[in-house]
Amino acid sequence: MATQQQQSAIKGAKVLMVGAGGIGCELLKTLALSGFEDIHIIDMDTIEVSNLNRQFLFRRSHVGQSKAKVARDAVLRFRPNINIRSYHANVKNPEFDVDFFKQFDVVLNGLDNLDARRHVNRLCLAADVPLVESGTTGFLGQVTVHIKGKTECYECQTKPAPKTYPVCTITSTPTKFVHCIVWAKDLLFAKLFGDKNQDNDLNVRSNNSASSSKETEDVFERSEDEDIEQYGRKIYDHVFGSNIEAALSNEETWKNRRRPRPIYSKDVLPESLTQQNGSTQNCSVTDGDLMVSAMPSLGLKNPQELWGLTQNSLVFIEALKLFFAKRKKEIGHLTFDKDDQLAVEFVTAAANIRAESFGIPLHSLFEAKGIAGNIVHAVATTNAIIAGLIVIEAIKVLKKDVDKFRMTYCLEHPSKKLLLMPIEPYEPNPACYVCSETPLVLEINTRKSKLRDLVDKIVKTKLGMNLPLIMHGNSLLYEVGDDLDDIMVANYNANLEKYLSELPSPILNGSILTVEDLQQELSCKINVKHRFFSEILNPVLNSVWFLIILPSTFPKLFHFTESRNQDGLSLDIILGFSNVTIRRVLTMFETGRRLTHPLLILFCHREEFDEEKEPEGMVLSGWTPSPATNGESASTSNNENPVDVTESSSGSEPASKKRRLSETEASNHKKETENVESEDDDIMEVENPMMVSKKKIRVE
């Protein structure tokens, strides 16, 4: 039972919720029933049919409407006396600035992507407002508390490559291939070959309620005398053509997004496919055989080959024809199986056609099968548990019970007989570039990299800045904003196409850049290190190690040793004789000619990194290591052995002894897999405690 003090704190609190999806619906309900009376909600998404099975505040009549607005209206029906304000907008919009965040006592996150989470984290730091972060994936979940100066911020620990991928509004605005896979697998395949009575988002073509649902249903119904190929073309034109055109009618949706391209079969396929192949007649497989395939008749043999739009369209039609010709008895009862060759071919083709429409890179059958076979569906119960934990931590924040703050993990299997694992929050990471003043180090080829590379790949992608400003000394090299005149915009755009060493204020080895984001009120320093060796040695450093020995006949040798890290390579050079200069040795490597000097031994060892190889030889470092106070190794080696992970269920251990607790047991980390979240709301950032102390970050 809450004390009078708790009730007063709850009643008078002004709370900001970011996200009104799976966690958000549960959270808003729990906040309202717990006594909170002033709640603001931000969410840019609209309601989809696929949301209805777990986002209980929404009904079928709400499909296409704002999640934030409908959630508000639903809660006000049973708590009419409280104040709830909704915003159907992107939290990164300029109106949600630091001053906007300062009005709240606590911010509660139920977001689905890293970019938005980082943005909210920085605004909370700038506004000095506590943040309660959360996420779920399947049966796993986590809730963390972030208080400026007292606990680590959301970005104090580096986030490993995502093991789960959020599928944001897969039916309307896909941005990744996995979104297209989920659409093809859970919507289109299920609609055509699964339970006909199960509603999904393909039943709704637009937000126009005047459109006939019966007309839409008729598209998916095949009459007995309808030619299979014509039926396939009808489905093709509906889902890839008319549905896309209907989506384009909503101008607000595409205001800041790339507009998709409607695709019709007549523009891609020949008039008739009957003469092109006769697979439905010549196929000798038995009815129901999972190995029936559309590929042989189309001359497609390699599953790792990337199909173009025409090939994907042919596979789409041919696979659909084979389902009706060879597996008709199964239609109406089929579910996707990654071992069903024809199902995988159909889903791959459909996903690739949709990806082509939305400007997303295509994938091979082999790649698509791997993605489609690792779908992790959302669990409503996990969302409810996490929402309750968020409210518990929010109440502690309002009471300022710092000693009682907990980071809580919801586990799939009991650990020490517990499914909920609470631990004390971590101290701020002194090496964090977001909540501390740690300078960054950027190793880059200043003569071959342009300012655009720095802005796009480092400042925006890696540092997550939205409105960056870049200064070198007193020279302003780049800035964005609505208040710039045309001349300034032209000058900054011209700078983007210049190499770093050729800018008005050249960026060279040893240059120190100041990078700021005025919207996030974030500023950091970047020390630039020019990567000279990568210009010449990269082409020859292809093997793991090699040894070159030249004739050694001269006395009085001296040794010069150079150890560097270049593109993941530890390089040791031992030179003999004083007149063997570095330049002459490099000339030998470039031309292939042997020098007449006594000795050259070159040892090369490739280091292993968890992140993907960076483009253009850029490496950003200086902010990724965990603080020594949390027990992480301070070694600079990337090949260090993994540190042991200590779990604490009671939170009684000192902060200096704790480790990052994984959401899953250590045994579950033995096999690295990529999980794909099939829903569109509340994705948990799975953090591997064995990987948080890496020194280098590879630029994606």
Swiss-Prot record:
What is this protein's name?
SUMO-activating enzyme subunit 2
The UniProt disruption phenotype note reads: Embryonic lethal.
The residues the record assigns to binding ATP are 19-24, 43, 51-54, 67, 112-117
The record's section on Pfam families has: ThiF, UAE_UbL, UBA_E1_SCCH
The record's subcellular locations are: Nucleus
Q: Which GO terms describe its molecular function?
A: ATP binding; metal ion binding; SUMO activating enzyme activity; transferase activity
Question: Which InterPro entries does the annotation name?
Answer: ThiF/MoeB/HesA, ThiF_NAD_FAD-bd, UAE_UbL_dom, Ub-E1_IAD_1, Ub_act_enz_dom_a_sf, UBA_E1_SCCH, Ubiquitin-activating_enz
Q: What is its main location?
A: nucleus
Chain residues that bind Zn(2+): 153, 156, 432, 435
Q: What does this protein do?
A: The dimeric enzyme acts as an E1 ligase for SUMO1 and SUMO2. It mediates ATP-dependent activation of SUMO proteins and formation of a thioester with a conserved cysteine residue on SAE2.
Q: Which UniProt keywords apply?
A: Acetylation, ATP-binding, Metal-binding, Nucleotide-binding, Nucleus, Phosphoprotein, Transferase, Ubl conjugation pathway, Zinc
Which is a Gene Ontology cellular component entry for this protein? nucleus
Q: Where is the composition biased (Basic and acidic residues)?
A: 661-674
Renumbered to this chain, region (Disordered) spans 200-224, 614-700
According to its UniProt record, in which pathway does this protein act? Protein modification; protein sumoylation
Q: Record keywords: Disulfide bond included? A: no
Biased composition, Acidic residues: where in the chain? 675-685
Family designation = Belongs to the ubiquitin-activating E1 family.
What processes in GO biological process is this protein linked to? embryo development ending in seed dormancy; protein sumoylation
Q: According to the UniProt entry, what is the EC number of this protein? A: 2.3.2.-
Q: How does it assemble?
A: Heterodimer of SAE1A or SAE1B and SAE2. The complex binds SUMO proteins via SAE2.
